[in-house]
From Swiss-Prot:
Its cofactor is [4Fe-4S] cluster. GO terms for molecular function: 4 iron, 4 sulfur cluster binding; ATP binding; ATP-dependent FeS chaperone activity; iron-sulfur cluster binding; metal ion binding. This is Cytosolic Fe-S cluster assembly factor NUBP2 homolog. One of its GO terms (biological process) is iron-sulfur cluster assembly. It is found in: Cytoplasm. ATP binds at G27, K28, G29, G30, V31, G32, K33, S34. InterPro entries: Mrp/NBP35_ATP-bd, NUBP2/Cfd1_eukaryotes, P-loop_NTPase, YlxH/NBP35. Component of the cytosolic iron-sulfur (Fe/S) protein assembly (CIA) machinery. Required for maturation of extramitochondrial Fe-S proteins. The NUBP1-NUBP2 heterotetramer forms a Fe-S scaffold complex, mediating the de novo assembly of an Fe-S cluster and its transfer to target apoproteins. Heterotetramer of 2 NUBP1 and 2 NUBP2 chains. [4Fe-4S] cluster binds at C200, C203. Binds 4 [4Fe-4S] clusters per heterotetramer. Contains two stable clusters in the N-termini of NUBP1 and two labile, bridging clusters between subunits of the NUBP1-NUBP2 heterotetramer. It comes from the Eukaryota. Its main location: cytoplasm.
Amino acid sequence: MAAPNEFYETLKQRLAGVKHIVLVLSGKGGVGKSTVASQMAIGLIHRGLKVGLLDIDLTGPSIPTMFGVADQQVHTSSEGWVPLYKYDQRLAIMSIGFLLDSRDEAVIWRGPKKNAMIQQFLSEVCWDELDCLVVDTPPGTSDEHLSIVDALKLCKPDGAILVTTPQGVALSDVRREAEFCRKARLKVLGVVENMSGFACPHCKDCTNLFSKGGGEKLAQEIAAPFLGAIPIDPMLGQSLSRGEDFLASCQAAPSYEAVAALIDPLMAQLGLVQATADTSTPSH
């Protein structure tokens, strides 16, 4: 492994062409963090931007499935790992899932090995010029998060998006995540409430299954922007399971407007502008 100073300098050079870095965090698993990360990446692509999506959720990598590339593997070059590209080379994807023999293989590693893999992921991937790198992190707060934030310190990430659900337990967990961000000096760019009621696929009416408005109240507590609430929508889940571009193929879905509405506030936070007036679907 490279000496610490050498590692940081190598990483800084690797990410020199990346304009913005956004981490997506959640206080616990199962709240839809990867769903939000994937849709933010896709939404930015539809604005004509070039995006990287780095899946560092080592024990539950779901990004490959969401983009229909779970059966593919990445290749190495003399420069390092080459990410998979989709959508006219405008989306670069890297995930631990590409390195496993099968999608059902369990990753049972101790902390030091996980941290070493995170350093590899960050420093040995050949990213091209990117408008934004979206990092899908593991759930919770652990040594892995400390490793990610520490490794990126010279690259000055823009901040983090916190994903929660309306339930009290999830909100309590994400409060701890917000405290982690404060201690790590990582700006909270916004809060997203996922699974905010159940959206009927027929009439699109939303029924509250849990308490309502918890994510927005949390955002007020920590003085962070509330980016929106996404209802439980079978069409969204089915689209992701099929590896489809939800924003392009499911515009009649009950959750479509809520998902699409996340993009403008994120771009405003990052100071990004739409690269083209053409928001048509990029080819795969």
